[in-house]
Amino acid sequence: MYQSPRRLCSALLLRDAPGLRRTLVPGPRRTLAPPVLGSRPKSPQLQAAAASGAARSRPRTVSSMGNGTSRLYSALAKTVNSSAAAQHPEYLVSTDPEHLEPIDPKELLEECRAVLHTRPPRYQRDFVDLRTDCSSSHSPIRVMQWNILAQALGEGKDNFVQCPVEALKWEERKCLILEEILAYQPDILCLQEVDHYFDTFQPLLSRLGYQGTFFPKPWSPCLDVEHNNGPDGCALFFLQNRFKLISSTNIRLTAMTLKTNQVAIAQTLECKESGRQFCIAVTHLKARTGWERFRSAQGCDLLQNLQNITQGAKIPLIVCGDFNAEPTEEVYKHFASSSLNLNSAYKLLSPDGQSEPPYTTWKIRTSGECRHTLDYIWYSRHALSVTSALDLLTEEQIGPNRLPSFHYPSDHLSLVCDFSFNEEPHELF
């Protein structure tokens, strides 16, 4: 049966949140103030979301679920069944966008706010202006990198001992994830540990104007968890009104000639405004201490694949990922010294421009507290410039129980950068 986007959006929320069928009592208001540096064109849907976000600090009464509003709250629940991933073994790029009607982001934000009304406010993060010369004649490209924490792993395997079980409930956590995406309005979204692609992110983000690709791990650890939602993997989304897809490659990474359980997606996109092409890639390397050589081999394999896709660095490149590696590891050094001439964007936030942030993930497990820098956005330094980057949460904001929490939905912080093409992109060396 056909469902309007409005009903669809509410259905996705309510499928996992039957409590919302009751009248919601207004709780402490949560603040969403999208910190956008400068003016940048957005899709009409995301412009509406930004306008809604600016007004979020004003108190509002949350309506009951009867009558007209029931259509809204019927929406984050009835799309694809939870077992949808098993029904899509081919993991195709996307459904036909002509058969999808857009969602109003303001309505989506309102639904998320209603679900999250009892949670504390989300913290503001500001963009740091990194421009060193006059701005480009074209609109910057905003890229978001984020390991969103697979739901099955958060509930079943990752042992976040200081995180209340209630903070991990999917019906609320997915709204925090969506809220973060809507707040920063990325043109390109690179995600890891996605285990709700078909039933949440693909149907919703496609109606916000994104085209998506999902590539699961062949032997996802999520499948070992009871009541899982299918395998986790990498997902890549881009705004269709800004970019044209030229090519897409799913890469199963190898190490010592052996195929591994880690994957990557690499896509060549063309900017509709400027006509310039670039490659965007997302990956998630092997985790855990003791696997450093394995990660190094995976990184070398990924670099070789990207070398071929970019025609020997002729095409500018952006690589986003959870590398599960500190800057002292070999795989980091491989990327820093690659012939692709890559630089790590978040080094630019340091006083000398040479140091990575002190952490991108901070959690407490049964084995102890883990504070590491594992997530990166690499870019072709002679073809692209970073014009701004989103600052990280402070230790005080993260709090003593660390991540995830009622404030923040993942154990990894999102990284967001604005890129512009250098005026002479052919001079890569």
UniProtKB/Swiss-Prot annotation:
Repressor keyword on record: yes
A GO molecular-function descriptor: NADPH phosphatase activity
Substrates-to-products reaction catalysed: NADP(+) + H2O = phosphate + NAD(+); NADPH + H2O = phosphate + NADH
Cofactor annotation comment: Binds 2 magnesium ions, but the ions are only loosely bound to the protein.
Keywords in alphabetical order: Biological rhythms, Cytoplasm, Hydrolase, Magnesium, Metal-binding, Mitochondrion, Nucleus, Repressor, RNA-binding, Transit peptide
Entry EC no(s): 3.1.3.108
Cofactors that this protein relies on: Mg(2+)
Metal-binding listed as a keyword: yes
Signal sequence coordinates: none
Induction of synthesis: Immediate early gene (IEG) showing acute responses to several stimuli including serum shock, phorbol ester, lipopolysaccharide (LPS) and rosiglitazone, a PPARG agonist. Exhibits a high amplitude circadian rhythm with maximal levels in early evening. In constant darkness or constant light, the amplitude of the rhythm decreases. Expression is regulated by both light and food-entrained cues and by the CLOCK-BMAL1 heterodimer and PPARG. Up-regulated in cells undergoing adipogenesis.
Superkingdom of origin organism: Eukaryota
InterPro entries documented for this protein: CCR4/nocturin_mRNA_transcr, Deadenylase_nocturnin, Endo/exonu/phosph_ase_sf, Endo/exonuclease/phosphatase
Binding site for substrate: E193, K217, P218, W219, N261, H284, L285, K286, A287, D322, F323, N324, H412
Chain segments carrying region Disordered: 21-68
One BP term from GO: deadenylation-dependent decapping of nuclear-transcribed mRNA
Cell compartment(s), UniProt: Cytoplasm; Nucleus; Cytoplasm, Perinuclear region; Mitochondrion
CDD domains registered for this protein in UniProt: Deadenylase_nocturnin
Range of the transit peptide: 1-73
Free-text tissue specificity from the UniProt record: Highly expressed in the differentiated adipocyte (at protein level). Ubiquitous.
Gene deletion effect: Mice exhibit metabolic defects including a resistance to diet-induced obesity, decreased fat storage, changes in lipid-related gene expression profiles in the liver, and altered glucose and insulin sensitivities. Exhibit a delayed early embryo development and at 12 weeks of age show enhanced skeletal mass and increased osteoblastogenesis.
Gene3D superfamilies per UniProt: Endonuclease/exonuclease/phosphatase
Subunit structure: Interacts with PPARG.
Functional note: Phosphatase which catalyzes the conversion of NADP(+) to NAD(+) and of NADPH to NADH. Shows a small preference for NADPH over NADP(+). Represses translation and promotes degradation of target mRNA molecules. Plays an important role in post-transcriptional regulation of metabolic genes under circadian control. Exerts a rhythmic post-transcriptional control of genes necessary for metabolic functions including nutrient absorption, glucose/insulin sensitivity, lipid metabolism, adipogenesis, inflammation and osteogenesis.
Protein name as catalogued: Nocturnin
Lineage: Eukaryota, Metazoa, Chordata, Craniata, Vertebrata
